[in-house]
Amino acid sequence: MKIVEVKHPLVKHKLGLMRVADITTKDFRELATEVGSLLTYEATSDLETEKVIIDGWCGAVEIDRIKGKKVTVVPILRAGLGMMDGVLEHVPSARISVVGMYRDEETLEPVPYFQKLASDLDERLAIVVDPMLATGGSMIATINLLKAKGCQHIKVLVLVAAPEGIKALEAVHPDVELYTASIDSHLNEHGYIIPGLGDAGDKIFGTK
């Protein structure tokens, strides 16, 4: 599995601000969008381009244009919505596919409770966004859904990832690409990433 820890100074700086314990909802939400945007910039660096001729102010001009690769952004509810706008800044014409997951209290396994996916996933690059890759369960289940619908090209964008989640994701879906602002130390006994960001969903939405 391709794993990219984006170490750009802007990413490191903004992520550091997100780790502050008493950060406001407004600041956390804005930074999630900004870091999501920077991760998207990295994740789309391999998109193919083609030469086309346009009418410029001085006549015909040859330019580069993205070569017909359609994109869908897939936020995992609810926290993933906080990164969605950062992706759309770069690919504003992308379709939005939404997946909702909850954890079964008995099995502790993620269970999908909502999905609204692009109808032509087999033709699209799916960019899945979720602030945290902790155990990897929700991400794996989401990718299972996408592949079941024919999606063949998937990139994952997370703000922080735990080594345990990366290992779990790679074991099941070695063909996906992972882009993260930080690979953190570990998961604690409650399944939280350390040092992590706390509960990203609560911080983005301001509700528990």
Swiss-Prot record:
It is an enzyme of class 2 (transferase). Its cofactor is Mg(2+). Binds 1 Mg(2+) ion per subunit. The magnesium is bound as Mg-PRPP. One of its GO terms (molecular function) is GTP binding. Pathway: Pyrimidine metabolism; UMP biosynthesis via salvage pathway; UMP from uracil: step 1/1. Its EC number is 2.4.2.9. 5-phospho-alpha-D-ribose 1-diphosphate binds at R78, R103, D130, P131, M132, L133, A134, T135, G136, G137, S138, D199. Uracil binds at I193, G198, D199, A200. GO terms for biological process: UMP salvage; uracil salvage. Allosterically activated by GTP. Keywords: Allosteric enzyme, Glycosyltransferase, GTP-binding, Magnesium, Nucleotide-binding, Transferase. It comes from the Bacteria. Disulfide bonds: none annotated. Pfam families: UPRTase. It catalyses: UMP + diphosphate = 5-phospho-alpha-D-ribose 1-diphosphate + uracil. Belongs to the UPRTase family. PANTHER family: ADENINE PHOSPHORIBOSYLTRANSFERASE, URACIL PHOSPHORIBOSYLTRANSFERASE, CHLOROPLASTIC. Catalyzes the conversion of uracil and 5-phospho-alpha-D-ribose 1-diphosphate (PRPP) to UMP and diphosphate. This is Uracil phosphoribosyltransferase. The lineage of its organism: Bacteria, Pseudomonadati, Pseudomonadota, Gammaproteobacteria, Pasteurellales.
